[in-house]
């Protein structure tokens, strides 16, 4: 992965056409698939909420990592399919002109894991996902502590397009520089889902229960309405084999012992 500090990776280094001007964070480009990654430093953050399913609030230490600024796109996933002969998503929208920079959907958890391994990364743990979404200030939403329907893609503003490009809604960028961690598509995480996991999870780099029936999904989507689903702490379980038009994913890569190449 090619690291950049205080500068923007050149467009020709990317495998897809996404606007990312204006980001001032420490960025890198994952060479395998062109994903723009942002560095999240090691440290504690308050995970969870007082609401049912998201409680209790608890301090978690998360080691440093890189996370995708954007969700993986249809164009990127098409490259993966061509390189590996992996099965296509359940729809063929990834082949439509103008859709290559929309998030890939209609993929299972195993599909997302296969892509991540091919790209040299992994799915984020739900702790990694939540820390990035809430930013250094630990906000309720990526942009602040108050719901603002204009800052993310949801049922009331989707129009006829359902998803939007992964660089859409710049007003909803998190404090770490990630786009659309509220709305557009739910995102697969690595962890099994457990309602009571927070009461017994480790305080350092939690990875979820050892087993379960559902995998964690985060973020809310274009088909959801109301502020609840879009909170950074909101957790939901999804059947790993279920493919739908409102679920995608983004990559993470470890920051140590060195930036991957």
Task: Write out the residue ranges for each language-model feature.
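A short glycine-rich, aromatic-capped structural motif
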Residues: 28-89, 106-110, 182-183, 251, ...
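Hydrophobic alpha-helical segments, principally membrane-spanning helices and signal/leader peptides
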Residues: 6, 26-27, 58-60, 93, ...
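Short small/polar-residue motifs
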Residues: 11-15, 33-35, 147-149
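Generic cytosolic/nucleocytoplasmic N-terminal low-complexity/intrinsically disordered segments
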Residues: 9, 73, 155-157
């Amino acid at each position: 992965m090619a690291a950049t500090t205080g500068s923007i990776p050149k467009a020709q280094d990317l495998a897809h056409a996404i606007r990312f001007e204006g980001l001032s964070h420490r960025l890198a480009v994952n060479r395998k698939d062109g994903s723009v990654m942002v560095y999240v430093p090691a440290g504690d953050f308050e995970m969870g909420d007082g609401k049912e399913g998201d409680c209790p609030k608890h301090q978690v230490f998360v080691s440093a990592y890189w996370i995708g600024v954007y969700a993986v796109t249809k164009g990127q996933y098409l490259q993966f399919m061509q390189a590996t002969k992996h099965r296509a998503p359940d729809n063929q929208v990834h082949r439509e002109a103008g859709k290559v920079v929309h998030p890939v959907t209609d993929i299972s958890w195993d599909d997302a894991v296969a892509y991540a391994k091919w790209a040299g990364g992994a799915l984020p743990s739900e702790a990694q996902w939540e820390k990035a979404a809430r930013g250094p200030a630990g906000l309720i939403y990526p942009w602040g502590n108050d719901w603002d329907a204009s800052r993310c893609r949801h049922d009331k503003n989707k129009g006829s397009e359902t998803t939007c490009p992964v660089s859409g809604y710049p007003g909803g960028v998190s404090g770490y520089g990630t786009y659309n961690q509220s709305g557009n598509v739910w995102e697969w995480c690595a962890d099994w889902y457990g309602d009571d996991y927070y009461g017994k999870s480790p305080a350092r780099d939690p990875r979820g229960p050892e087993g379960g029936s559902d995998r964690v999904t985060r973020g809310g989507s274009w088909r959801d309405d109301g502020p609840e689903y879009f909170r950074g702490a909101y957790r939901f379980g999804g059947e790993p084999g279920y493919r739908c038009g409102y679920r995608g994913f983004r990559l993470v890569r470890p920051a140590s012992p060195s930036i991957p190449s």
